[in-house]
Amino acid sequence: MRLFLCEKPSQAKDIAKVLGANRKGDGCWQGTDVCVTWCIGHLLETAPPDSYDERYKRWNLADLPIIPEKWKMLVKPKTASQFKAVKRLLGEARELVIATDADREGEMIARELVEHCRYRGPVQRLWLSALDDASIRKALARLLPGHETFNLYHSALGRSRADWLIGMNMSRLFTLLGRQSGYQGVLPVGRVQTPTLRLVVDRDRSIADFVPVPFWTIDVQLEHAGFGFNAQWRAPEDACDDQGRCLNQALAQQAAADIGNAGTARAVKVTTERVREAAPLPFDLGTLQELCSKKFGLGAQETLDIAQALYETHKLITYPRSDCGYLPQSQHAEAPAILAALQRADASLAPLQPYLEPQRRSRAWNDAKVSAHHGIIPTAAASDPSRLPAKHKAVYTLIRARYLAQFLPNHEYDRTQADFDCAGHALRAVGKQIVEPGWRRALPEALTPAKGREAPPAQVLPALREGQDCTVQGLQLKDLWTQPPKPFTEGDLIKAMKNVAKLVDDPRLKQKLKETTGIGTEATRASIIQGLLDRGYLVKNGKALSATPAAFSLIDAVPRAIADPGTTAIWEQALDMVQSGEMTLEEFVARQSAWMGKLVERCSGMRMTISGPAAGAAPPWKKKRRGGGKGKAAAGKPRQPRKKATT
């Protein structure tokens, strides 16, 4: 029997249909000499400390660090029946095809079962990027040898064990240190969650410490040949800060008076350049979460859940947990069929049809930049998006629009910059004249990538020549204040986690971080943020995230290395080295274990002052063990709701 092992029931059903395995069995779909079974996420979990020694049931500083000599895995009680079915089928199989998600975690979900159940037969890998019938058939025709993806398993296993070492040891350590100060709650510490929390704490402190500074601007309304437009006063450099803002009120007031009295402004320099903008890349998960947060107010986890449903349930998009926006060259051959399906499914795309060029290859098609997964794009299994729930439709429309944009011309416009002299003061006007809408026909203005504060004003300038005079129609002298940094939204935090290199000063570390995925992965960032919200470290007010008092206290107490975004990003790079074979799993775990021992020794004598939940929660060792989801090392949660208090 040939056994296909999938990650979830819905995935198994889709693959079984293509294989003709239509008979429902015990935890599987059966066909002629083929069987398709499934996991329900991880069927196994890393054993808790008390599985290694009974004394670890009680939390004690003297027992730290806890470092297993031989790691144990336990069957999750909630899914034990499915584990039994998978174990039985592995015992009967003559050949195994791993068909879990095509990523590190999917590899681990399957391989840990193969190892635990001692399957020794041949292994192949089904590498799927979409779950529509055509994509499944294509992947079945190109099965990979099992050894090609084995290191993904060791990379995921290394991540899991590092999470366990830090979560179990540091959470116990800081919870016990907190108890010495009278704090009765649990203080969970994580390899990824703590640096993420520090990002928010640092941002909140920047906001709290911000001192506003006044500055002045002058907007001038000019007119030429009956055509009105706006220009801005350009203050002398010695009167401005590094952002070009005038800090001299008297100078601004004098300039406003002079400009108002002058009556005319003379054009001294006029330049026009043709600007060509390529279409934005298809989405990776992070950029999709960022834009959905900004545009729709969706949380990171909510966006991921919607994308997962569009992938698994509706079969409308490719694999969503991708960290790459590029597409393989081979995928371009499928473009005509996908474009035709999209247009058949939605009549509202008809006005776009004359402009689409299926043969066009945008910069998105680049084999050199494609990682394990390509950008998130629609599949040929398109259907009318109006039948989707409102939020699902909104997310799908974004993904579809980014794909359609790849087959439209560049967006082109003429950017004109006109400099004026007005009573000895410099003015500047910037105009934009669209020449070719191009890919913006597919993307509403609000959904295109933001260009920041330097975007040209949305105005068209009249035909101007140097030496021409324009009439001053009016002006506004504005008294403004510098603004503090904005609180993080979930989308902003996802972006900061990805681009953590920008927050690191060390040039060598910064360069290394630019080559990594930042804090966490595309698949885990949403759950990290949600976990911080669930544990009461973060609160959400509208779209804005802010840290609680307990978060400030914890970040101040933990060793800098644990809370430093640069450190955790380097760990992710080490996991990439395990994946590529440059470092062994054993070497990675040994380094983590040695580092953990040093941290425990250094921190055991600390004294803490904690703000957070009220006293009175049950001791952590009396709580029932709580199982974590993908990528989590559960360290326990207080049963009582968190309350604001200071101990």
Q: What are the language-model segments listed below?
A:
Residues 240-281, 566:
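Metal- or metallocofactor-binding catalytic centers and their adjacent structured scaffolds
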Residues 210-235, 262-306, 489, 511-512:
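C-terminal accessory/connector segments of nucleic-acid motor ATPases
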Residues 1-3, 101-102, 183-186, 272-281, ...:
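Conserved short loop/turn motifs at secondary-structure junctions
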Residues 1-168:
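Intrinsically disordered, low-complexity regulatory segments
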Residues 2-3, 79, 116, 171, ...:
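Basic, low-complexity terminal or inter-domain segments flanking catalytic cores
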Residues 71, 78, 84, 91-92, ...:
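C-terminal or mid-to-C-terminal helical accessory/interaction module adjacent to the motor/catalytic core
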Residues 314-317, 536:
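Glycine-centered, phosphate/nucleic-acid-interacting loop/turn motifs that mediate DNA/RNA or nucleotide
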